From Swiss-Prot:
InterPro entries xref list: Aldolase_TIM (IPR013785), His_biosynth (IPR006062), HisF (IPR004651), IGPS_HisA/HisF (IPR050064), RibuloseP-bd_barrel (IPR011060)
Keyword match Lyase: yes
Family classification: Belongs to the HisA/HisF family.
Keywords: Amino-acid biosynthesis, Cytoplasm, Histidine biosynthesis, Lyase
EC number per UniProt: 4.3.2.10
Pfam families, A to Z: His_biosynth (PF00977)
Function according to Swiss-Prot or TrEMBL: IGPS catalyzes the conversion of PRFAR and glutamine to IGP, AICAR and glutamate. The HisF subunit catalyzes the cyclization activity that produces IGP and AICAR from PRFAR using the ammonia provided by the HisH subunit.
Top EC class, one word: lyase
Record text on subunit structure and interactions: Heterodimer of HisH and HisF.
Regions crossing the membrane: none
UniProt-annotated catalytic positions: 11, 130
Name of the protein in its database record: Imidazole glycerol phosphate synthase subunit HisF
Pathway: Amino-acid biosynthesis; L-histidine biosynthesis; L-histidine from 5-phospho-alpha-D-ribose 1-diphosphate: step 5/9
Encoding gene (name): hisF
C-alpha cells in the first residue's frame, strides 16, 4: 500500500500567505518563506504554492517567490496559478517546481494538459478542480471560484486523466475554510474511479477530518491550510494520529 501524504498549501497573494473561507474573506497567514521552512521542518510530504490571483489578473505566477521557497525546502513543490502555457510551466520548473498545477487554463484549453504531459511527463502535471454542489450535481468553477463552467465534475475529472493529468487536486468550494471536513461524497466518487492519485482539499478542521478524507473519501493525499497555518495542529501531530488510526503514512 502506498503511503498517504499530508500536503500543506500556501495560497499566495501580494507576496503573503493568505487563507479565506469559500475563496473569500482572505486573511493574512504569514510569510511565504517562514511558512515554507516550517512545513519542511515539520516533515510535510509535499508543499503546494498557489498564486491565487494570477489567473484573475492574467499574469504569471510570482516565480521569484517560488525560487526562494525551492531553495529552502527539500520536499516536492507543486506550483500553480497563471500556468497557461508550456513556456510558463518550463519557467516554473526552472525556478524549482517539481510539479505544476493547472486549473483555469486547462478548462480554457484542455489540450494544454496533453502538451504539458508530453513535455514534462504526467507525473509532473496536476490538474486542480474547484467544485461546488449546485443541487443536481457538482459543477466545476474557474478563476479562483468566480466563474461557473457548466462542466460536471466527474466528467471533467475523467477527461483530464485521459488528456494526461498525473494527479487531481479536488477542492470543495463549499467546504473551503469552513473546517467542517472534506466533502467525502464526491471525493470518494472521484478517487475510486479516475485511476490517478486524488488530493482532498477544502474543509479540514481537525485531525479526524484528515482521517475521514482517507478512510471515507479514499483520497491519496490530504491538503490542508487553516489547521496548519494557524498552528491548531502540526503536521507531525497529524501523522502520528493517522498512524495510530491505521493509515499508512510516512513519519
Amino acid at each position: 500500500m502506498l503511503a498517504k501524504r499530508i500536503i500543506p498549501c500556501l495560497d499566495v497573494k501580494n507576496g503573503r500567505v493568505v487563507k479565506g473561507v469559500q475563496f473569500e474573506e482572505l486573511r493574512d497567514a504569514g510569510s511565504i518563506l517562514e511558512q515554507a521552512k516550517f512545513y519542511n521542518d515539520e516533515l510535510a510530504d509535499e508543499l503546494v504554492f498557489l498564486d491565487i490571483s494570477a489567473s484573475i489578473e492574467s499574469r504569471r505566477t510570482t516565480l521569484e517567490e517560488v525560487l526562494k521557497v525551492s531553495e529552502q525546502v527539500f520536499i516536492p513543490l507543486t506550483v500553480g496559478g497563471g500556468i497557461n502555457s508550456v513556456e510558463r510551466a518550463r519557467e516554473a520548473f526552472l525556478h524549482g517546481a517539481d510539479k505544476v498545477s493547472v486549473n483555469t487554463s486547462a478548462v480554457k484549453e484542455p489540450t494544454l494538459i496533453s502538451e504539458l504531459a508530453e513535455r514534462f511527463g504526467s507525473q509532473a502535471v496536476v490538474v486542480a478542480i474547484d467544485i461546488k454542489n449546485v443541487g443536481s450535481h457538482y459543477e466545476v468553477f474557474t478563476h479562483s471560484g468566480k466563474t461557473p463552467t457548466g462542466l460536471d465534475t466527474l466528467e471533467w475529472a475523467h477527461k483530464v486523466v485521459e488528456l494526461g493529468a498525473g494527479e487531481i487536486l479536488l477542492t470543495s468550494m463549499d467546504r473551503d475554510g469552513t473546517q467542517k471536513g472534506y466533502d467525502n461524497v464526491i471525493l470518494k466518487e472521484i478517487s475510486t474511479s479516475v485511476g490517478v492519485p486524488v488530493i482532498a482539499s477544502g474543509g479540514a478542521g481537525n485531525l479526524q477530518h484528515l482521517y475521514e478524507g482517507f478512510s471515507i473519501g479514499m483520497a491519496d493525499a490530504a491538503l490542508a491550510a487553516s489547521i496548519f497555518h494557524f498552528r491548531q495542529h502540526s503536521v507531525r501531530e497529524a501523522k502520528a494520529f493517522l498512524q495510530e488510526k491505521g493509515i499508512a503514512i510516512r513519519l
